[in-house]
Amino acid sequence: MLQKLRNSTFVAIVLAARGTLLICCLLLFCYLLFSTLTNTFLIPTNDLLGDVASILKGELWRVITSTVYFSEWTPLIKTVLIVLVLCPFIEWKIGSPVLVMSFFASSWIGILLFCFGFGGIIRSTVGINTYVYAFYGGTLSVYALFPLAVLAFLIKKPAFSLLAKCVLVGGLLLYFTVGFWPSSDTPEPAVIVQISQLCGGLSGLFCALIIVALRNWKKVPFFSTKPSN
């Protein structure tokens, strides 16, 4: 029985989730670090969060800090929960380094798209004085996990077991419930949430396409090695 458990694909997926563990540890560490900076050294919270107006003015360092900074415990726990549920399966198919890079790259791409692509729409929707004071870049990475999870399903090898497929489908249902289902107590207008979901999804799709291209570029005749005469 124990031997079957050791040989099961699901257990192998969980034990190989080093990139997932790294992402969660980084998010928790940065939460404790920034909490110390804001509470002990009294650094203003707004200096660390993603701010559309500030990023549009050129404060691009906010793109980095907003990815790993959460000023509240609830959105952090939601993000970590979804990462723990979905990322091990994605990591099993694409590898730990690619997962970690995709998670943070999708956040940065999503933030830039959110600010520079839809900044004008956001401003015209909720007003010039009140439009989106701050946002969490890590949340955009959560939205980006859906295209990556679909990619994990499409990659044939290594194959998922039936149990792994069931858990992944259940994780996707949890993902839509926690990540996409609108919350009644959210302070943001619905259009802002929809735009953030769109930006996260597009950034995840972009990362998925890059992964597919890198996995298959040697199969393209242009890049394949030509036989020597």
PLM features per residue range, with description:
Residues 4-45:
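N-terminal signal-anchor transmembrane alpha helix
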Residues 1-15, 172-229:
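C-terminal transmembrane module of polytopic alpha-helical membrane proteins
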Residues 31-102, 118, 187-192, 196:
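N-terminal TM1-TM2 helical hairpin plus the immediately adjacent luminal interfacial "cap"
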Residues 151-171:
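Membrane-helix boundary/juxtamembrane motif in polytopic membrane proteins
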Residues 90-93, 150-157, 206-215:
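Structural signal for the C-terminal ends of transmembrane alpha-helices
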Residues 73-75, 130-151, 195-199:
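Membrane-interface loop-to-helix entry segments
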Residues 22-31, 81-84, 91-145, 167-178:
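Small-polar-interrupted transmembrane alpha-helices in polytopic inner-membrane proteins
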Residues 38, 118-122, 155, 182:
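Short helix-capping/hinge motifs at transmembrane helix termini and TM-loop junctions
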